[in-house]
Each structure stands twice: as C-alpha cells, then as structure tokens.
Amino acid sequence: DSQSSRGIFTIESEQELRDRFAETEAFTNSGDYVLVERYIEGTEFTVDGIVIDGTHHTLAISQKEHYAYNRNIASKLFFTNYNETFDYDLLRKTNDELISGTGIKYAITHSEYKFEDGDYYLIEMAARGGGSRIASDIVPFMSGVDNYQLLINAALGQTPSVEDLHTSDAEKMKERAAVLEFLDIESEGKKISKIEGVEQINAIPEILQLQLEFKEGDIIEKAQDDRSRVGFFIARAESKERIEEIEKEVKNTLKVSFES
C-alpha cells in the first residue's frame, strides 16, 4: 500500500527475509504488517486505458525491462501497439474484462501484468494514469485518444462515448512506438565533474524530455527504488526502428565524467 517500489524485495532465503523485513514494514501505510506473494517469473508489462460508462478500453501497452542489479526496479518501458513475441490482443482482453468488472464508471487507469506459462497475471492496478508523462503524453501519441480531456469532460457532465476512441489514423497509429528509459549511472563515490551532450539530445526531434536528477558536483548511486533513479528520457516516433536508433544515439551522446 505504498508506491514507487519502495520496500519491495525479491526474497530467496530466510536470512534475506530477516534482513529486509523492517525496511519493508517501514513503507507500509496501513498497519504493522508486510505483504508476501509468490514471485511470478516472466516479462512484465504496463497497460494504460480509460473507463467510459463502466466499460474499460485499453489504449497503450509497454514491455518493461529492469536493472540487472535489482529486478524490482524498471529501467525501460517500450511502447508498441503489437508485439511479435507476446499476444497484446489477449492482454487487452484480460485487462478490459478485469477493470470493467470492478464497477468503476469513469476513470483513466494504469495496470501492470506479468506473463508466465501462457497467462497474464495482474500485479497491480489503479484508477490513475501512468507517471513520468505516460498518461499525459505517451498514451495520446500511441492511441490518438486524448484521455485526460475525456476524463475532464466526464467530470463536467459531458458524457464521453466510445466514438471518442475512434481515430481516422488507426493504421498509422499501429506502427508508432515510444520509450521511457531510465538512466543507469553510478559514480562509485566520485563527484561528477562534467556533463556533456544534453543540448544535442534535446535537439533530436523525437525526444520529448530528457530529465537529469543530478548536476556537476553530485555523487550518484544505483537506484534503490523508483524514486531514486537518476534520470530518464522519453522519445516518440512513427516506428520502433526509429526508437531503437534514438536509444543508441542518446547513450552515445550523453557523457558523464567523474573526478579522478
């Protein structure tokens, strides 16, 4: 009942449980307890959508990657409208049926799933949009649907309809892609002496945002939870191939130097 993956750990021994228990309990907001779940192996996904008159409509899906040193913290969300490996139509159906069954009338939504042994397992869901500009900028780009405007209209008594979800550019939207990628930089106790490449990256037309949570003189460490990640960039393009090119360009352009 917290947020930002704080207090979440993958436990593989009794000693790890003892070592992590107090920290996990400290992030519980509703009492002196912790939640223990079976660990679900497999690839993780985010799913954003909107509920209109009690029926949920999935609008954007991302496949997640995680830091090698902590598999509970996402390092990248790659958005596409179809996936050659995973059945996104099944994921849409699963998500739509599940959220429609909650009885909520109007809301934007953000859910997370894992795929294991042929099934999608719900990890969490909420009646809010995905953070880091997912709901505000990535979802409309991927779907052609202004989800926030529809929600505002509903709050003002202007009932949205399913027709508002239709777009004349559906075929064009199908090939679109976007990425929210978090930086993986550690200074190993040394202060940052120089940061280069920011202006060049911001000049890339498809870059929506480059956010650095550090400056020259800082000492930065590996992320311990979602909130302690040191920065990110968001890119949107008409194809996943272009997104992959931009990812390489950003990594080759951003240079962070440290004091010797």
Regions found by a protein language model. Give the residues of each.
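Active-site "cap" helix and flanking loop/linker of ATP-utilizing ligase/carboxylase catalytic domains
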Residues: 90-111, 126-191
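A short catalytic or substrate-binding loop motif that flags glycine-/basic-rich loops and adjacent residues
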Residues: 1-2, 39-42, 103-105, 175, ...
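Peripheral (often C-terminal) accessory segments that flank ATP-dependent C-N-forming ligase machineries
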Residues: 152-260
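A short, polar/proline- and glycine-enriched secondary-structure boundary/capping micro-motif
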Residues: 68-72, 132-136, 174, 203, ...
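Internal nucleotide-binding/catalytic subdomain
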Residues: 7-120, 129
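Short, well-ordered beta-strand elements within core beta-sheets of diverse protein domains
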Residues: 9, 38, 80, 140, ...
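A short, flexible beta-alpha/helix-coil linker loop
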Residues: 1-5, 131-132
